Structures are given as C-alpha cells and as structure tokens.
Swiss-Prot record:
UniProt keyword Repeat, yes or no: no
GO BP of this protein: L-histidine biosynthetic process; methionine biosynthetic process; purine nucleotide biosynthetic process; tetrahydrofolate interconversion
Stored InterPro entries: Aminoacid_DH-like_N_sf (IPR046346), NAD(P)-bd_dom_sf (IPR036291), THF_DH/CycHdrlase (IPR000672), THF_DH/CycHdrlase_cat_dom (IPR020630), THF_DH/CycHdrlase_CS (IPR020867), THF_DH/CycHdrlase_NAD-bd_dom (IPR020631)
CDD domains: NAD_bind_m-THF_DH_Cyclohyd (cd01080)
Originating gene: folD
Record protein name field: Bifunctional protein FolD
Subunit structure, interactors included: Homodimer.
GO cellular component: cytosol
Catalysed reactions, semicolon-separated: (6R)-5,10-methylene-5,6,7,8-tetrahydrofolate + NADP(+) = (6R)-5,10-methenyltetrahydrofolate + NADPH; (6R)-5,10-methenyltetrahydrofolate + H2O = (6R)-10-formyltetrahydrofolate + H(+)
Pathway: One-carbon metabolism; tetrahydrofolate interconversion
Family in the record: Belongs to the tetrahydrofolate dehydrogenase/cyclohydrolase family.
Gene Ontology molecular functions: methenyltetrahydrofolate cyclohydrolase activity; methylenetetrahydrofolate dehydrogenase (NADP+) activity
Organism for this UniProt entry: Vibrio vulnificus (strain YJ016)
Amino acid sequence: MTAQNIDGTLISQTVRSEVAARVKARVAAGLRAPGLAVVLVGEDPASQVYVGSKRRACEEVGFVSKSFDLPASTSEEELLALIDELNNDAEIDGILVQLPLPAGIDSTHVLESIHPEKDVDGFHPYNVGRLAQRIPKLRSCTPKGIITLLERYNIALRGKHAVIVGASNIVGRPMTLELLLAGCTTTTCHRFTKDLEGHVRQADVLVVAVGKPNFIPGEWVKEGAIVVDVGINRLESGKLIGDVEYNKARERASFITPVPGGVGPMTVASLIENTMLACEQYHTK
C-alpha cells in the first residue's frame, strides 16, 4: 500500500477562496470587512515569518489587517493595555498575539486578557472549555485545520482509535478534544507515556506533534492508518521534514500529510475562518 497524500496547500486555498467570497458578499451588502489585529513583540526571525504569512493571507481574502510591531523591551503592562484597547475596538474582530513572547511577559496572562469573542487563535480557556463541552465556537487553529483536512478528504473518523503523540496546549490537548468530538476513541501520549510504540501501532488515526525530526519510525504505523504529521523541522541541509519517518510510513498508511504542504497551510486557513466566524457571529451590528 502507498498512502495518498493529503494536500494541505490545495485545501487551504479552497478555504481561503470560500472566505474571500463571504467577505465580498458582506461588503456588497454594505457591511464592513472583518478586521484582524496582529501583535508581534520583539524581533524573533521565525515569528516575523509566521506573522508575515498571516498578514498576507488576511489581505488576500479582503480583511483589514492591523499590525502592531512592538519592541522586545515592551512591558507586560504595555502589552495588556494594547490588548484592552483592541478588545474595545469595534472594527477589530480578532486579536492575534504571536508566540513566543519575550522573557518577563506571562503569556498565559496575556492570552487570557484577549476577549474570548476575539480569540481567533482559540487559546483562551473559555474557548478550549467550549470545545471540551462539545459546543465549540472559536477553535484552536491547527487542530481545527486538521479536522477540516480530514473532512475535505471524506475520511470517516467515528469509531476509529486515534492516537495523539504530544500533549501541548497548542496542538495535542485540543486535538484530543477535536477527535473525541468527531467520535474517536482517543489516546494521548506524552513524555511520561510507557510503551509509545505499542500505542502507535494500534492507531487507526495517528497525529504526531512533538517537534522532533523522524521521531516516529515508519514501521510503527499500522497498515491502512491515517497519519497526520504536525512537525516542521529544519535540518542543517535546509530541508524541512516532519516528526514521522515519511517514506516508510507512506508505504503502510492509507492517507498521510506531507511536510511541507500538509498541516502547515491549514493553520493560517483556520485563523482566517475563525476571524470570519467571529465577525459574523459576534460583531456584526
């Protein structure tokens, strides 16, 4: 068996086109375009790249993108004051604070200060709690994007055993909640998990998000499994690879996300969808 690649680049473009059409219809009806505020603190090169891609995506679909680039010396109080201002700005539907934040700033405190109805990253405890209660609104972008990918490929999830490797607040934990909501039986593995191989070998759906190149050997993948590789690791050669040994895993899986071009593009597409949703459901007067 050779797995079919799940094309995140293609699906993300489709999602963006759908959102662009909704924006066009709003503006034609005399309503304002959705607004996203993107806050970057400091000059971390990777963060600058990510923020740039998010801003471009916003502009492509017709959003109003407002940029706030703050120096690394910014205090937590100054950042919280800006967020408070944006929370009260009627033309801003979403607030995105790029992580990581410089040392000395409590990221949990900052993320919790964003109004839940403008939390388009889906990190606020209120929004994670809604997902846990099976009434999601603004969902964490990467897990939401993964579910969108699987849905667009008509991959049925109900009744499958899903194994999530990695338990971060950004991917692993909300991914577990998403797959529970989709009707999977879920196992979440982390640094204290015993017999990781045994768990992985049982997975009908395998989601790996640990940030370690080729962490999961391809031979561990169950025949016919659906493999979602969230990892993006740059080797010294400059090549990007995932957390799963792709070539060997592809020989055993039925579907697999490549790196790059799999999950990555969907994170930004989900951010765009969330901003549209926030505008339509919460802020349209």
